[in-house]
């Protein structure tokens, strides 16, 4: 019995010690440091504090962050005027808390109410704004405003687009960190646009569920944002915070062509380094004005300087007639080989005709190509680009213009052959030059010709080592004679490619895809594309199924991020699938159906030449 009593006493002693230890630990967890009225939270005390204080606003910050430093005194002042604690977490130290609450930037404020949350703080960043936001939400009668961002699905998407003139749509994935960061800003923008009476509507699509919509709109990453105006889609290239979204979309809602009441307004509007398009109209109810306005809307993202005037003084200065629509070339790039402007005036003007006119004459004989204007001013082929230290700012203009004049002398000789010429800054396009093998060419001027065929023809630095005009003249003769060699971006061809799906790279594209003895189905993919990854197993399954029954059809794939394909195989999103039947290699057929095996079989059956004949069994 003595042993039993001693053993029992020992157990009791251990239990008491454990309880005291636990109590001591709890006391440590509830020991919070205060800094100017703000509670300092750490990974150790965070959960205990929230358990004791179920309503709290927490600021996640970084000591080096400028916005955090600006917010700090306002946050401290607000802490003494609100009815709940304000707390802060140094997320550069408490990294686990940062990961737990998916903190993407600084400062990020999170709000808990009655133990529920967190919700993102989207109020002001001053004392009054913080106090107002917090007190409104801790009010027992507070009800959050209804969500203004419309959730779109396959069922309601078309109606929403057709019923609203201007829409911004976000395609997102629930797991995407950037999407989560955008969400409160996007909703805040929608709320404020509504309050302003704006006609702009904001919508969102969960592209992981609405896969057909994602495919239709070329979604290859998240978030992807598209502007849809009167049914036509455009990429959204604006900011991703509320104020920026509001300003960008408000600008988008204004007429694309600016009204210029007086001559002085027109003069100020003229661009020094880009084309300016001015419509001269006696009245705004003419067919020409309507066509001009429609075309301006279609070209809103391409031409930022489009305006119209009715001022007689402006008509007189530029010798314009009513309904003249004039493209003015920037004075910086005038030359004696071309007019300073081009005029369009047709009795039955149409927006389609104007679009063609604008694009045909969107750049001077030799303008400056930049990353900003390359996709709008310099899409017409063949295009000859001369890369050097092209800087037309006042300090370096004379030297840059000297070399441009050399290019002009050659360019004017090829106007009749429809060649378009441009100069470009070699530093701005350093990556592109490196990809073409010209990153360390040793030449002061590098030249690349972008051909009709979609191929790129770099001037070989080992062959052309003279002066610019001499090199360019000789290289253009080589281009015209068809003797220049094209550069093809290509990953190494696989040494062992015995799988059911053939791997195509730039260097073996012609051999595999343009094989006239085979019909070829080719998928263009990106390694990071989720849709491509989910489709891969189905594609392999289809290839295996057809290997024995359809020996004259080849299923292939190509990583379009590291390989060049001919221009007729245009890739705008991932995955993109083309069918190149025998005899029709120059006109491949783009597949636009579901990524379903039976649908793909039907597609190939319909278009097959060497395969899927009537005698073949599916």
Curated annotation (Swiss-Prot):
Gene Ontology molecular-function annotations: protein disulfide isomerase activity
InterPro entries to which the protein is assigned, alphabetical: PDI_thioredoxin-like_dom, Prot_disulphide_isomerase, Protein_diS-isomerase_A4, Thioredoxin-like_sf, Thioredoxin_CS, Thioredoxin_domain
Catalysis performed (reactions): Catalyzes the rearrangement of -S-S- bonds in proteins
Location in or out of the cell: Endoplasmic reticulum lumen
EC number of this enzyme: 5.3.4.1
Disulfide bonds: 65-68, 176-179, 529-532
GO BP field: endoplasmic reticulum unfolded protein response; IRE1-mediated unfolded protein response; protein folding; response to endoplasmic reticulum stress
Main localization (coarse): endoplasmic reticulum
Stored PROSITE patterns: ER_TARGET (PS00014), THIOREDOXIN_1 (PS00194), THIOREDOXIN_2 (PS51352)
Cell division among keywords: no
Gene Ontology cellular-component annotations: cell surface; endoplasmic reticulum; endoplasmic reticulum lumen
SUPFAM superfamilies cross-referenced by the UniProt entry: Thioredoxin-like
Alphabetical keyword list: Disulfide bond, Endoplasmic reticulum, Isomerase, Redox-active center, Repeat, Signal
Prevents secretion from ER (motif): residue ranges: 615-618
Domain Thioredoxin residue range list: 22-139, 138-254, 480-609
Signal peptide extent: 1-21
A Pfam family: Thioredoxin_6
EC main group: isomerase
Family of the protein in this entry: Belongs to the protein disulfide isomerase family.
UniProt protein name: Probable protein disulfide-isomerase A4
């Amino acid at each position: 019995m003595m042993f039993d009593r001693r053993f029992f006493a020992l157990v009791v002693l251990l239990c008491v010690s454990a309880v005291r230890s636990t109590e001591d630990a709890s006391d440590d967890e509830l020991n919070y440091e205060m800094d100017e009225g703000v509670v300092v939270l750490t990974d150790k005390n965070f959960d205990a504090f929230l358990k004791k204080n179920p309503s709290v606003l927490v600021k996640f910050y970084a000591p080096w962050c400028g916005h955090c430093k600006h917010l700090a005194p306002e946050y401290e002042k607000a802490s003494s005027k609100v009815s709940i604690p304000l707390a802060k977490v140094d997320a550069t130290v408490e990294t686990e808390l940062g990961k737990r609450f998916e903190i993407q930037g600084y400062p990020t404020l999170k709000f808990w109410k009655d133990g529920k949350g967190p919700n993102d703080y989207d109020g002001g960043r001053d004392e009054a704004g913080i106090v107002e936001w917090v007190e409104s939400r801790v009010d027992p009668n507070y009800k959050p405003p209804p969500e203004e961002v419309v959730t779109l699905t396959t069922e309601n998407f078309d109606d929403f687009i057709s019923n609203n003139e201007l829409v911004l749509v976000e395609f997102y994935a629930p797991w995407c960190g950037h999407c989560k960061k955008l969400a409160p800003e996007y909703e805040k923008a929608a709320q404020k646009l509504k309050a302003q009476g704006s006609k702009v509507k904001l919508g969102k699509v969960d592209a992981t569920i609405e896969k057909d919509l994602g495919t239709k709109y070329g979604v290859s990453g998240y978030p992807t944002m598209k502007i849809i105006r009167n049914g036509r889609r455009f990429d959204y290239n604006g900011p991703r915070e509320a104020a920026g979204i509001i300003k960008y979309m408000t600008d988008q809602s204004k007429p694309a062509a600016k009204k210029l009441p007086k001559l002085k307004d027109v003069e100020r509007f003229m661009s020094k380094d880009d084309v300016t398009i001015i419509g001269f109209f006696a009245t705004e109810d003419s067919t020409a004005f309507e066509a001009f306005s429609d075309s301006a809307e279609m070209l809103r993202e391409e031409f930022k300087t489009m305006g119209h005037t009715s001022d007689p003084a402006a008509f007189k200065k530029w010798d314009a007639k009513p309904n003249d629509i004039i493209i003015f070339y920037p004075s910086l790039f005038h030359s004696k080989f071309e007019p300073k402007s081009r005029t369009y005036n047709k009795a039955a003007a149409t927006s389609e005709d104007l679009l063609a006119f604008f694009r045909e004459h969107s750049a001077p004989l030799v303008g400056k190509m930049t990353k900003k204007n390359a996709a709008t001013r310099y899409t017409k082929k063949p295009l000859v680009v001369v890369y050097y230290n092209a800087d037309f700012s006042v300090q370096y203009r004379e030297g840059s213009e000297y070399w441009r004049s050399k290019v002009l002398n050659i360019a004017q000789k090829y106007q009749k052959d429809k060649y378009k010429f441009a100069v470009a800054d070699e530093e701005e396009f350093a990556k592109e030059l490196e990809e073409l093998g010209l990153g360390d060419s040793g030449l002061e001027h590098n030249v690349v010709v972008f051909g009709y065929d979609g191929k790129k023809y770099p001037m070989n630095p080992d062959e052309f080592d003279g002066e610019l005009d001499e090199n360019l003249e000789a290289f253009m003769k080589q281009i015209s004679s068809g003797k220049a060699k094209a550069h093809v971006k290509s990953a190494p061809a696989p040494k062992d490619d015995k799988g059911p799906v053939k791997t195509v790279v730039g260097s073996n594209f012609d051999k595999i895809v343009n094989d006239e003895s085979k019909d070829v189905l080719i998928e263009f993919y990106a390694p990071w594309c989720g849709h491509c990854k989910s489709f891969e197993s189905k594609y392999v399954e289809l290839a295996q199924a057809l290997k024995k029954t359809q020996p004259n059809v080849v299923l292939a794939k190509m990583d379009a991020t590291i390989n060049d394909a001919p221009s007729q195989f245009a890739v705008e999103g991932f995955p993109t699938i083309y069918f190149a039947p025998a005899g029709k290699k120059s006109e491949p057929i783009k597949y636009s159906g579901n990524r379903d095996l039976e649908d793909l079989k039907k597609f190939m059956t319909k278009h097959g030449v060497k395969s899927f004949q009537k005698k073949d069994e599916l």
